[in-house]
């Protein structure tokens, strides 16, 4: 059965199941720490049959671990499918391949790493008109990251500000005339991993090497204490390989449309 990780004991079990798993330990662990005792935050955390856990926020779900095999696994997949339908989740990331009725596989995400203690050659600094900011205002940053969705920008702003206020991670931006035009940040961390995310350049300023400079610079800073990891869709794999990051795995990605499923 699906159990809400709403007690200290169940939250401890949730953390045990994601321990030492790249991407999942830092992201799900940070979210549980920050939001696990605040149901009104919009985040929800569950223990599933087998070794699996589930995180939900809005229409997005993340599943780490494995459901049981055999008949118990069939029952677990049926229960999970109904649960996701009930909560209107339409995107799902998983540690392992998973077959659920009505869900279609999308291109998996590639997981990248820069090991602790390693650094990459820093790309050339941008022209002087671009001013580095190591503690930018998160409101304009959120509007840059999600320029086409105020709702997603608001969600990102809330989560990022909560993380930074609790000493988790950091944000970097390049400002042009006082406005962020390129950013990357780290808003989830475990004891051994800093997860980088939200690397975005304003389309008007793309192709100038701004993202290369910010991403490598932040990764080099963070590897002093932890390994750096992040995930990307296939279109960006060549970019990160060229910078020198190492591929270490895949994160499965699934979508559904409950109107047609």
Positions of the model-derived regions?
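Short amphipathic alpha-helix that is part of the acyltransferase structural core
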Residues: 1-29, 108-112, 116-156
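A conserved beta-strand-loop-helix scaffold within acyl/acetyltransferase catalytic domains
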Residues: 56-57, 152-200
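Conserved acetyl-CoA-binding loop-helix of GNAT-fold acetyltransferases
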Residues: 72-83, 197, 201-203, 207-221, ...
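Conserved active-site alpha-helix within GNAT-family acetyltransferase domains
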Residues: 97-107, 212, 234-251
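Conserved catalytic-core motifs of GNAT/GCN5-like acyltransferases
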Residues: 105-117, 246-261
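Conserved hydrophobic beta-strand within the GNAT/NAT acetyltransferase core sheet
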Residues: 227-233
